[in-house]
């Protein structure tokens, strides 16, 4: 994931900062506890495509 892209994209739900989870290949919004998938290296920033983080994932 290009760090320059992370600087300009935001969570589509709250407009908050997204964090890259390299292991899961997801962009994480810690404010909304959502994980947005990457498909072929392209972020899918659609609320209906996001998954809710588990309570363990939210803590880390």
Swiss-Prot record:
GO cellular component: a single term: cytosol
Transmembrane segments annotated in the record for this chain: none
Alphabetized InterPro entries for the sequence: Trm112-like
Highest taxon of source: Bacteria
One Pfam family linked to the record: Trm112p
Family affiliation: Belongs to the UPF0434 family.
PANTHER family: PROTEIN PREY, MITOCHONDRIAL, ZGC:162634
HAMAP family linked to this entry: UPF0434 (MF_01187)
Protein name: UPF0434 protein YcaR
Species of provenance: Salmonella typhimurium (strain LT2 / SGSC1412 / ATCC 700720)
Chain's gene name: ycaR
């Amino acid at each position: 994931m290009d760090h320059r892209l992370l600087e300009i994209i935001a969570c589509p739900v709250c407009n908050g900062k997204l964090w890259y989870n390299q292991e899961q290949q997801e962009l994480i919004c810690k404010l909304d506890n959502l994980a947005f998938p990457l498909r072929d290296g392209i972020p899918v920033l659609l609320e209906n495509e996001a998954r809710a983080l588990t309570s363990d994932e939210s803590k880390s």
